[in-house]
Amino acid sequence: MTGRDAAVRLADEALAGLADAAARVPGARVPGPRGGFGLLGERGEVVGEERWTDRSCRLLRTADGWIAVNLARADDLDLLPAWLDLEVGVQESVWDRVADAVAGRDAIAVVEQGQLLGMAVARVPAPEEVTEGDVQLMSRRMVPPGGSHVRIVVRPPAVTPPAATAFVVDLSSLWAGPLCGRLLAELGLHVVKVESTTRPDGTRLGSPEFFGRLNGDKGHLGLPLATAAGRAELRRLVSRADIVIEGSRPRALAQMGIDPAAVVRARPGVTWVSITAYGRTGPWCQRVGFGDDAAAAGGLVDRGADGAPALVGDAIADPLAGVVAAAAVARAHADGGGVVLDVALREVARVAALRAEASTAAGAA
């Protein structure tokens, strides 16, 4: 089984779970049969396969392994001098220079240096590595059989039946969180996408059709989150929500004056889902990550005959985490809420990677 096959199967299971949960919510639209393959490759379907020739993430060899480097943002290039003491000329290949610079360095050290600068860089674990030695997974109790997300019970579930008219506030951006919100909107829930008026969702800079697919069935609200008044309005909106979707690192939420557990504790039936690269807790909770590098950090890569890793799919941890999160939210809502769900792209990818490795080992036995 390839990494992509394992990811598709995990997405299929999540979609089935989403439908089962919807059937327990009075008035919700129960989705018909749907495969995960299409959702995981949806962006490529919309924007075309030519994007593969110039993707922002590469897997690069270091002195003792491999790392994923994702230069997805325009200002990432400005950080290269501080990260690698590297100046890139106009006529030079950025990737050739970066590859040369990391080739003689220790993978863990170069990743830590990049992350301190806010760069989306990650070490790719070797197939034989024991996950029980991973400090982030151990701190989050996500070593086997840890599962695909952390579920924290904050208060007893609501006594009143869940409603299909639930109010969902979607604070997320890019792919994973918006996909989660879209899948909930398809059940009939009222989803409102909230964006900063000064820093809107970065997906708007890409394909309008893809942005529309993720967010077309939602209401939209822009708030001046750089102002105290805008942040106060955001807190009022969140306090009215039955479900909140967000993808911010813990530090960013705290700066907004928002505590997920406090929001859930304040009112019966509330479900909060956080979808981040490495999770809300643990020593890596403030690390930056996107779909490709987070998947590689979870070991969800394909390997050639020489053992060299290759990226799987298109930012595959993003849509996979979005589907897993939607199923988890639907189950929690059907059960009466009262929980904070913590979904990490890396951990969702890791579940698929472990399945692929187990299948390969079984086939070789």
Question: What is the meaning of each model-derived region?
Answer:
Residues K218, L311-D314:
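Short beta-alpha connecting loops at secondary-structure transitions
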Residues M1-G202, P208, A228-I243, P260-T281, ...:
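Acyl-CoA thioester-binding alpha/beta core of soluble enzymes
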Residues G188, D217-K218, A241, F290:
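Short, well-ordered alpha-helix to beta-strand connector turns
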Residues R231, S248-D259, G282-W284:
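Glycine/threonine-rich flexible loop motifs
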Residues G282-D292:
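Histidine-centered active-site microenvironments of extracellular/periplasmic hydrolases
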Residues G212-R213, V264, W284-Q286:
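Short glycine-biased active-site loop of nucleotidyltransferases that positions the nucleotide triphosphate
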Residues A226, R249-A252, A277-Y278:
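Short glycine-rich anion-binding loops that position phosphate/pyrophosphate groups of nucleotides
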Residues P208-A226, A296:
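N-terminal glycine-rich dinucleotide-binding loop that anchors FAD/FMN and/or NAD(P) in oxidoreductases
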